[in-house]
Each structure stands twice: as structure tokens, then as C-alpha cells.
Amino acid sequence: MTEPVVELEDVCFCRKERQILSDISWRIEPGAHWALLGANGCGKTTLLKILTGYEWPTFGTVRVLGKRFGRCDIGKMRKLIGWVSSAMTQRLPAQDSAIDVVASGLDASIGLYRHFTDEEYEASLNVLRQLGAESVAQQHCITLSQGEMQKVLIARALVSRPQLLILDEPCIGLDPASRQHFLNDLARLAKKGDAPTIILVTHHIEEIDPWIQHVLLLKDGKVLASGCPDDIITCRQMSALFDYPCSVFRQGADFLLRMDG
């Protein structure tokens, strides 16, 4: 039997007597792509940090890729988990080239701390090529557009061939055209036979495309609901999630949200 990619059991997280996550149980099977949906401040970022070993739960059990956190080498695990966040852009050395940023993903590091081989640079260039971003390989990060930077960060996450890819609100800062191009690229990636299991974190239902098979709603640090998109993305659930009357519409395969207040 294949082990789940993610298995959280009764995870709680407290900081300075404040409970941020409560009784989170979540199981993700290989190849099952999920969206994690919730309002700002609901605990999404903390949950991601727990999944990647940057925070430790106060209570509960975390298993990722069959390994129980606390009983495995977290450094090695991070090389198997790709994490893309717009916040990462601020931590990148401004003068690093795009291909340097991608290559740093081989070590799960921010910046380069060793000499990379020609083969490693070629592998990095190949991932950029697959994402249609080969032309920016030698450009400094500081000169890249937001859309180009997102492709570079995706390439950085993919270069080590991760088994789990976490995208933390990747469309923040993108104009409508750039966002649609990005979502199209992501859909193509998800449909590849060797694609990693993907978790897309967002608070916009418009970004939940048909390749996403499951949705988890997080509210006030607790699981509000989880299941297939058609069952979860409803007027009732969205109104409860955002504490505001909402209507949900379909335009073809796309979800649309209207605030009714």
C-alpha cells in the first residue's frame, strides 16, 4: 500500500498562550492535488511551516512522504518538498541571477554556498526552459517582473524533483493576464505524469482550476470542511469561511465568487 504524501493527526500549535491551529487532521494521497483555502490570518502559513519542518506542532503527529517529523533528517526532507512563496523573493540576494536562484533549490538554500557543476546548471536551465523562462536565466533577480520571478521560484522548487510542491498564494502581485498565464502553466505541470503532488494555498476560489481534486477550508485555525471542489465551494461554505454573505457561480469550469453584503 502506498503511503500518503501528507498525514497530519490532531495537530495543534500554540504561541504565547494563543492557539493558532487546533486539531488539524489531513491526509493527502500521492498524486491528489489540493487547494488550501482560507482568509488572511486563519493559520495557513503556520500550517505550511509545520509541513516543511520550520515550525513544530505543540501537539499531534506530522508525517510527510512516509517520514515522521522528529524522527527523520529534516534537511533531507526539505529537498523533497518544493515550497514557493512570494515572501521568498525578499530573501533572495538581489544580484543573484535567475539560474543561480534555481540552482540553489538543489540544496534547499537561499543563495549559493558552494560551486555547482556544469551538469547541475544544465539541469537548472532545463527546468527554466520547460517553464518558458530560459530567456531570463542570466538576468539579475532585481530586474525580473513579478511573473518572471514566479516562474523562477517554481523552477527552483522543481529542480530537485520534489515529491510534494507547496504553492503559497503564488498569484499575489500578478496582473490578470500574468495570473492567467501562471495558472495555465501550473495546469500543464499538474497534468504531467511525473508531476509532484501539489498543494495550492489561496483565498481566491477563481484560482481553483479543474486539476485540483480536493479542497480544505481553514477557519480560525480549524478545519471547516474538506472534500471535492463541487461539494466544498458553495454559497453556504464560502459565507461561513469568510463570515460574509457570498454567492458562488460557475463560468465553464471556473468558480466565481460574489460578495453580497
Model-derived regions, located:
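Conserved structural motif at the start of ABC-family nucleotide-binding domains
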Residues: 6, 20-23
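Helix-to-loop junction immediately C-terminal to a conserved catalytic motif
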Residues: 52
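Conserved ABC ATPase signature
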Residues: 115, 140-144
